[in-house]
């Protein structure tokens, strides 16, 4: 976290740091393109999937393949980032998270879950999506879709990390704004509106900004942010 007491945006005068920030931003753009290249697997539905699978299995098979691709892409992407930029979002934090922040994160996670449940007739979103007539195929389809969405969420939190690190290099001081969350909203959030047909697409898009807020409050802890993002998405 930035410790400069000046909360105005002040760009770093060091050209090397500005160039470094551009590398972080370029990496974030590449990450977005790489993750949503998974949508190209839809092009295989007609020549391949429709001849082998029928009904809901088409979408299930697509989600499995796309999720595997995203996790593999992010794995290779992370290795490249660690080698070229010498950073990793998975570094351990020497100091434990203060109890006050844990309590705040708990409230910021539980409140939107309960609020969404209230709008859905006091049902968790997970129950609402499953419906009243639960079958094995319904459970399989939802589990696979959550796997696919979890893969995209992993990429989104990684993007938030890259944007925040890029801003650290670009600015010597800045307001405590979730710039990474705004970037995730404008990239992953917009892509979700374009590529998904869920009744919750708008909610999912707005949550990307929320993840950026959680990331900063957690002290930039990737694992904490990703875990809370999964809970918010599923429930």
Residue ranges and their predicted role:
Residues 19-84, 105-106:
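Alpha-helical transmembrane segments in multi-pass membrane proteins
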Residues 1-25, 83-97:
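N-terminal juxtamembrane cytosolic/stromal segments of multi-pass membrane proteins
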Residues 1, 19, 29-30, 107, ...:
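Acidic/proline-rich low-complexity IDRs
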